[in-house]
From Swiss-Prot:
Any GO BP: tRNA 5'-leader removal
Any GO MF annotation of the entry: RNA binding
Name listed for the protein in its UniProt record: Ribonuclease P protein component 1
Cellular localization per UniProt: Cytoplasm
Species this protein is from: Methanosarcina barkeri (strain Fusaro / DSM 804)
HAMAP family membership: RNase_P_1
Length: 110
């Protein structure tokens, strides 16, 4: 059985982003600022977000800044203390599968 890989703020850019909640906090396109939702797909240059609106939103990674919510396990008291991480979109500019492979290299040498 494979163990679940923990997502840490310091390694978020190397992980699968699909399923994470996200908010656009900075963009060269002012209409995108404040958009929230869940990442449902990703390409080299775009994050595709599902929100409460009627359609999927395609957000360019370049020249944007995102706030990701990393869910945590419930504590013994039944509380969550989710972590929020700001990421410059330019750090995500690569094909997702190549970015994810890089974490394996980090673990090998780290």
């Amino acid at each position: 059985m494979k163990s679940k890989v923990e997502i840490l703020p310091s390694t978020l850019i190397y992980h699968e982003l699909i399923g994470l909640e996200i908010q656009v906090i900075r963009s060269t396109n002012p209409a995108l600022i404040g958009i929230r939702g869940r990442v449902i797909d990703e390409t080299k240059n775009l994050l595709i977000i599902e929100n409460s609106g009627p359609r999927e939103l395609k957000i360019p990674k370049a020249d944007s800044e995102f706030l990701f919510r990393i869910p945590t396990e419930l504590s013994e008291k039944g509380r969550r203390s989710d972590t929020f991480v700001k990421i410059q979109g330019n750090l995500l500019l690569s094909q997702p599968e190549n970015r994810i492979k890089n974490i394996k290299k980090l673990r090998k040498w780290g």
